[in-house]
Design a protein with these regions (language model features):
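Long, compositionally biased stretches
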Residues: 2-69, 88-140
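Conserved, well-structured core segments that form or line functional sites
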Residues: 82
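Short beta-strand-centered segments at strand-helix junctions
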Residues: 71-78
Length: 140
């Protein structure tokens, strides 16, 4: 399948790389089909979450594993039922600023992807995490 992206032109992607949101990105309820785009130049800490239904819709996601000293999201039973059994990948929506060091990530509402099935959801954690956490604070 060939799809258009907001920032990276046209890309080819196998159907196995389609991510289906059972609980959509907040504010974007009409868009449920996405794919992750990795860029070798920037590593695996930041990826694009590109809509397959709207080429202009794309989010930057950040791997919050660098906050492992204090960020330990717990997935509720309800979310486990929604996502199904499998291995989960947790990503935080990145709000990129001109000065990267002032960028923030949403730790309260991560995007959780079942890596086995491709089912995803943006969830609100019951834990007390900030919606705008400075990306450089607590980074390893």
């Amino acid at each position: 399948m060939i799809y258009k992206t907001r920032d990276l032109g046209e890309r080819e992607m196998p159907d196995s790389k389609v991510i289906i949101f059972k609980q959509p990105i907040f504010g974007f309820d009409d868009y449920k089909r996405y794919t992750l785009i990795f860029d070798e130049e920037i590593g695996d800490q930041i990826v694009w979450l590109q809509s397959l239904e709207e080429p202009g819709l794309c989010f930057l996601l950040f791997n919050p594993s660098q906050f492992e000293d204090f960020y330990k999201p717990k997935i509720t039973e309800e979310n486990e039922k929604l996502l199904g059994t499998g291995e989960y990948a947790c990503w935080s929506v990145l709000s990129l600023k001109e000065d990267f060091e002032t960028s923030t990530v949403n730790l309260k509402s991560p995007v959780i992807i079942n890596s086995t099935t491709g089912v995803a959801a943006q969830v609100i954690l019951e834990q007390d995490y900030p919606v705008r956490h400075p990306i450089m604070e607590g980074a390893k």
